[in-house]
UniProtKB/Swiss-Prot annotation:
<dbReference type="InterPro" id="IPR008909">
    <property type="entry name" value="DALR_anticod-bd"/>
</dbReference>
<dbReference type="GO" id="GO:0005524">
    <property type="term" value="F:ATP binding"/>
</dbReference>
<dbReference type="InterPro" id="IPR036695">
    <property type="entry name" value="Arg-tRNA-synth_N_sf"/>
</dbReference>
<dbReference type="InterPro" id="IPR009080">
    <property type="entry name" value="tRNAsynth_Ia_anticodon-bd"/>
</dbReference>
<dbReference type="Pfam" id="PF03485">
    <property type="entry name" value="Arg_tRNA_synt_N"/>
</dbReference>
<keyword id="KW-0030">Aminoacyl-tRNA synthetase</keyword>
<feature type="short sequence motif" description="'HIGH' region">
    <location>
        <begin position="134"/>
        <end position="144"/>
    </location>
</feature>
<protein>
    <recommendedName>
        <fullName>Arginine--tRNA ligase</fullName>
        <ecNumber>6.1.1.19</ecNumber>
    </recommendedName>
</protein>
<keyword id="KW-0547">Nucleotide-binding</keyword>
<dbReference type="GO" id="GO:0004814">
    <property type="term" value="F:arginine-tRNA ligase activity"/>
</dbReference>
<dbReference type="InterPro" id="IPR014729">
    <property type="entry name" value="Rossmann-like_a/b/a_fold"/>
</dbReference>
<dbReference type="GO" id="GO:0005737">
    <property type="term" value="C:cytoplasm"/>
</dbReference>
<dbReference type="Pfam" id="PF05746">
    <property type="entry name" value="DALR_1"/>
</dbReference>
<keyword id="KW-0963">Cytoplasm</keyword>
<comment type="subunit">
    <text>Monomer.</text>
</comment>
<dbReference type="InterPro" id="IPR001412">
    <property type="entry name" value="aa-tRNA-synth_I_CS"/>
</dbReference>
<dbReference type="InterPro" id="IPR035684">
    <property type="entry name" value="ArgRS_core"/>
</dbReference>
Length: 590
């Protein structure tokens, strides 16, 4: 049960009654107001801004928003679940709910189990989440890891919310960087044959990770291509290097427990059985009057990618909010990267997705407008594109920057970080800051067993609540703690203020899940879990000094059973939230 949507519906019903009396317009949009937690807990359990939102429409029947708020509050006060509804300030409504209402919510949470928090109505949209899509030119670095974790957690969240989700990786296996990769692999191939290659020439990939590719090529081809012209071996080495790099990337992703259903090759856009899909996408836009031959004006004050003082094939991206029309072909007649991206996104639209989510590095921020323009044009406005930009990760150890990796050549690999601190620490910390904010990741801090380490703090909360049932089995061996018994618990016995705070945080979980899914912001789950863990640890500490507050109170078995039911629900919520983030929920931590 989402108590916020529940009371939104109840207030909407009150407003419909006022509409029926002729004092509000019949066409009033009842989705515009919100019901949310109040800014201060002392103000109640819910806050609604309906009277403020409809202040204009309320005149002349209501001289000001407060008058409308008073009428809504009076109607709410008659609701059997409302203890108090009062008007604050110019017209905000604060609502306090009866304990019995929260008792029913806890009962529903017990019934729903791991489904608690899942939106009640199944979503119909098909969503494509494309994430990672790192160039297959080397191992993944920590920046790639942030996008990988973000995309995977977002896909988990959307699937939990009922959307049809596809997890996709776009392999950038065409273009100049892949030729550079092939030439770098040829150098390592010659090295594997016994040549001394010395310093890696400028412009080639320097990392040791290509040595295994070179060795495989040497084993497969001997010295056939040692001194031959690049035209003879370039395609062979290109394919071998891409296969080797993608195998490495898949291993890196597996270390983070990340999988994709679809790996889509850029090369396939021009080499598939369907013919040249890039040409087809351009023709599609041309047929709609959105492609023309023309000249771009010179850039004003800033460089514009692909600008050349010549007649070019251009997409009318300015018709869809972009700053300048975009070239689709280079001077040598080959397609621009943007043209390939247009064709790729057209395949997503053709596959029936209504929402496309692209997870990119922040350095691609300047590319968002043109891609959004392309999706609008290709789908005629039917498909939504949401580009989520992931900011940099600053890798630290004890406050000092981490040195570069010899294996990668010029960066720290993701695998090195996962191997050092573990997958749970990497995943949680990558999500414990909003994706568009720079993240400082301290390798020393994330393995500390302290409240300053968020992943430990949340996992320890789960381990603590699971330990309560082990303690109950020892202290009260004849107490039935089965789920069936917990469902008979009397929640009206939970009268302590600390218990009430825990219950109210639990009640927010469905709202947090729904909001995070709709906003495409999985960090909200991490923040919520930290808040719940913090309240749990605080309540646990109070119980050390006040035995009657402990979850197991041997003198009151009925109260203990109610508290165990609360503990069970907390364990479910913590485990469910951690699962959405792709983080384990340990039952014990030593």
């Amino acid at each position: 049960m989402n108590i916020f949507t529940e009371f939104h519906a109840r207030i909407a019903a009150i407003l419909r009654g006022i509409i029926g009396s002729g004092r509000l317009p019949e066409d009033l949009d009842l989705t515009r107001f919100v019901v949310e937690p109040p800014r201060e807990a002392a103000h109640g359990d819910l806050a609604a801004n309906a009277a403020m939102v409809y202040a204009k429409e309320a005149k002349p029947a209501f001289a000001n928003p407060r008058q409308l708020a008073v009428e809504i509050a009076v109607a709410l006060a008659e609701d059997g679940d409302v203890a108090e509804a009062e008007v604050a300030g110019p017209g905000f409504i604060n609502i306090r709910l009866k304990p019995e209402f929260f008792g029913r919510l806890l009962g529903a949470a017990l019934e729903q189990g791991s489904d608690f928090g899942r939106p009640a109505t199944a979503a119909q949209e098909k969503i494509n989440v494309e994430y990672v899509s790192a160039n297959p030119t080397g191992p993944m670095h920590v920046g790639h890891g942030r996008g990988a974790v973000f995309g995977d957690a977002l896909a988990n969240l959307l699937a939990f919310a009922g959307f049809g989700v596809t997890r996709e990786y776009y392999i950038n296996d065409a273009g100049a960087q892949v030729d550079v990769l092939a030439r770098s692999a040829h150098l390592r191939y010659r090295e594997a044959l016994g040549e001394t290659i010395g310093a890696i020439p400028e412009g080639l990939y320097p990392g040791d990770y290509l040595k295994s590719v070179g060795a495989s090529l040497a084993q497969a081809h001997g010295d056939t291509y040692r001194g031959s012209n690049g035209e003879e071996w370039l395609e062979i080495f290109r394919l071998a290097a891409i296969d080797g790099m993608m195998a490495m990337i898949r291993d890196d992703l597996a270390a983070l427990n990340i999988t994709h259903e679809v790996f889509f090759s850029e090369r396939s856009l021009t080499r598939s059985e369907d013919g040249d899909q890039v040409a087809a996408a351009i023709a599609f836009l041309r047929d709609r009057g959105l492609v023309y031959e023309g000249r771009l004006p010179p850039p004003k004050g800033q460089a514009i990618e692909d600008w050349e003082d010549r007649e070019q094939v251009l997409f009318k991206s300015t018709d869809f909010g972009d700053d300048v029309d975009r070239p689709l072909k280079k001077s040598d007649g080959t397609y621009t990267y943007f043209a390939s991206d247009i064709a790729y996104h057209k395949t997503k639209i053709d596959r029936g997705y209504s929402v496309l989510i692209d997870v990119w590095g922040a350095d691609h921020g300047g590319y968002v407008k043109r891609m959004a323009a392309a999706v609008k044009a290709l789908s005629e406005g039917r498909v939504t594109l949401d580009v989520k930009l992931c900011q940099l990760v600053k890798l630290m150890r004890g406050g000092e920057p981490v040195k570069m990796s010899k294996r990668a050549g010029d960066f720290v690999t993701l695998r090195e970080v996962v191997d050092e601190v573990g997958v749970d620490a990497v995943r949680f910390m990558m999500l414990f800051r909003k994706n568009d904010a720079v993240l400082e990741f301290d390798l020393a801090k994330v393995i500390e067993q302290s409240k300053d380490n968020p992943v430990f703090y949340v996992q320890y909360a789960h381990a603590r609540v699971k330990s309560v049932f082990r303690q109950a089995a020892t202290l009260l061996p004849d107490l039935d703690c089965s789920l069936a018994a917990l469902k008979t618990a009397d929640f009206s016995l939970l009268g302590d203020e600390g218990e009430a705070r825990l219950i109210k945080i639990i009640a927010q979980f469905p709202r947090v899940v729904e909001g995070a899914a709709l906003a495409h912001e999985p960090h909200r789950i991490a923040f919520y879990l930290h808040d719940l863990a913090s309240e749990l640890h605080a309540h646990w500490t109070r119980g050390k000094d006040q035995p009657h507050l402990r979850f197991i109170y041997e003198e009151r078995r009925d109260l203990t059973l109610a508290r165990l039911a609360l503990v069970h629900i907390m364990a479910e919520v913590l485990a469910s939230g951690l699962s959405l983030l792709g983080v384990s929920a340990p039952s014990e931590m030593r």
